[in-house]
Amino acid sequence: MFSATRHCVAALALGVCFILPAQAKNQPYGEIATQQARHIATVFPGRMTGSPAEMLSADYIRQQFADMGYQSDIRSFHSRYIYTSRNKTQNWHNVTGSTVIAAHEGRAAEQIIIMAHLDTYAPLSDADTDNNLGGLTLQGIDDNAAGLGVMLELAERMKNIPTQYGIRFVATSGEEEGKLGAENLLKRMSAEEKKNTLLVINLDNLIVGDKLYFNSGQSTPGSVRKLTRDRALAIARSHGVYAASNPGGNPNYPRGTGCCNDGEVFDKAGIPVLYVEATNWALGKKDGYQQRGKSKAFPDGTSWHNVML
């Protein structure tokens, strides 16, 4: 977990620095995040959307926020996804997911959303099951217990600090089936709430990748990119953490931008996004999918949803 802790340091420093004044440093950065990530991964494996483990983990996260003094609740949402059988028959699977929201009120009406998905991969086909992808035993430490751990540590560090803007800590579900929880969250937001959302910070896959990346949404204005992505890179360097942004080797993903997780829902809605992830945008198709160089431990250079890795 050493790399995860290092990544946590950068993510926490990012949130603290561009939102808040100087903070107390009673504990080493990443210590709380590491403990929480390990607990969530080992106690709640198989956090598939709508499963008992997902509901229990959502309640655990809600209780953690409540213990910190936050107003916190769980919002259920109904959705569905397609499952493909071995004979190529496709059927809809209905699910009820759980989204956890905790509120830190600010002096102004504007808000920043800090988000990490709590669900693990559910097999979308018989082929997925045959290949040990997802299911009841997948702990999901990289995807995405570590992201939850970072979010919980940031919430702990910020709980007694007045802020200019409100902060919403959100643990979504249904990300693995197509960003279902994020879509529901956006759908429930009023036009005024969307207007007042200055930034969405999405934490996902913080361990396995070769490098820590800070990337902006494609619709995020240049001025906001400088205040968020570029400042995050500078903060990471100041903490001795090497961080990068997408070099733009794939024309579908321009330099300095990210994609392909819950943050994308808000990016497409025109809300500024900062993606925080660990991967390697210089490998494979240069789309961020290949997380690291291929090796005996990671034959494909990825750990995506594989119970065996």
Residue ranges of model-derived segments:
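Bacterial N-terminal signal peptides that target proteins for export
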Residues: 1-9
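Bacterial N-terminal signal peptides
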Residues: 9-19
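Second-shell loop/turn segments in exported
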Residues: 25-28, 41-55, 86-91, 133-144, ...
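Extracytoplasmic/secreted proteins, especially bacterial periplasmic and envelope-associated proteins
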Residues: 32-35, 39, 52-72, 146-153, ...
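A non-catalytic alpha/beta surface segment that caps or lines the substrate-entry region
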Residues: 39-42, 46-105
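Solvent-exposed loop/turn segments at secondary-structure junctions
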Residues: 46-47, 71, 78-82, 107-108, ...
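Active-site-adjacent substrate-binding region
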Residues: 76, 209-309
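Acidic/histidine-rich catalytic neighborhood of metal-dependent amide-processing enzymes
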Residues: 96, 135-224
